[in-house]
Amino acid sequence: MFTFNTIEEALKSLQNGEMIIVTDDENRENEGDLICAAEYATTENVNFMAKYGRGLICMPMGRSLVEKLCLPPMVLKNTDNHETAFTVSIDHVDTTTGISAVERGITARKCIDPNARPEDFRRPGHMFPLQAKDNGVFEREGHTEATVDLMKLAGLREAGLCCEIMADNGEMMRTPELISMAKQYNLTFVTIKDLQAYRRKQEASALAVEQKNMSPMDC
């Protein structure tokens, strides 16, 4: 009997620079994504995503980073089935073509550099930033929001990489195949539903502590 990993285990994996698998609801996309922190967008991690994920490698990030880098929406009217919030695609100016695993890693890591400026990135490019909703998976149950929520909870920069996972036959992997992949490569595997539950518990606990520490004069 397979048991999903805990969110705590996922956070530890991300902090250690490892990739994890995150799956959404079977009534939504019913897909799994490989996810890693932007800090750990290494050549090895990007190459693994390209080789074994096979989907589009994107870079979910919070609103503040999108605004800092002046990344406008890819389109004015978003008609995507799940309203995935693509911005213009980018390459860092230090790259050549921008498409290699090495150079996509450079672009991702440069995005979270505290000194990053909009003019440091060419447009269009081969890295696809996605803007997460402000309230994360409570507002939208997508891999974009899950990525940013997980980075926040892990104490990492609010940006990561995600890549949809396809099977050998070109179809999207579903849960049974994702379980096999997680076992084969020893990857932590969690669900967005569990992430929502974890956030509810953490935020309710934080609120209870805050209320307990309030003096009568604060009420």
Curated annotation (Swiss-Prot):
GO terms for biological process: riboflavin biosynthetic process. Its EC number is 4.1.99.12. Pfam families: DHBP_synthase. GO terms for cellular component: cytosol. GO terms for molecular function: 3,4-dihydroxy-2-butanone-4-phosphate synthase activity; GTP cyclohydrolase II activity; magnesium ion binding; manganese ion binding. It catalyses: D-ribulose 5-phosphate = (2S)-2-hydroxy-3-oxobutyl phosphate + formate + H(+). It comes from the Archaea. Signal peptide: none annotated. The record marks H126, E164 as: Essential for catalytic activity. Binds 2 divalent metal cations per subunit. Magnesium or manganese. Keywords: Lyase, Magnesium, Manganese, Metal-binding, Riboflavin biosynthesis. InterPro entries: DHBP_synth_RibB-like_a/b_dom, DHBP_synthase_RibB. It is an enzyme of class 4 (lyase). Mg(2+) 2 binds at E29, H143. Mg(2+) 1 binds at E29. Pathway: Cofactor biosynthesis; riboflavin biosynthesis; 2-hydroxy-3-oxobutyl phosphate from D-ribulose 5-phosphate: step 1/1. Coiled coil: none annotated. Its cofactor is Mg(2+); Mn(2+). Gene3D superfamilies: DHBP synthase. Disulfide bonds: none annotated. Belongs to the DHBP synthase family. NCBIfam families: ribB. Homodimer. Catalyzes the conversion of D-ribulose 5-phosphate to formate and 3,4-dihydroxy-2-butanone 4-phosphate. PANTHER family: 3,4-DIHYDROXY-2-BUTANONE 4-PHOSPHATE SYNTHASE, GTP CYCLOHYDROLASE II-RELATED. This is 3,4-dihydroxy-2-butanone 4-phosphate synthase. The lineage of its organism: Archaea, Methanobacteriati, Methanobacteriota, Stenosarchaea group, Methanomicrobia. The gene is ribB.
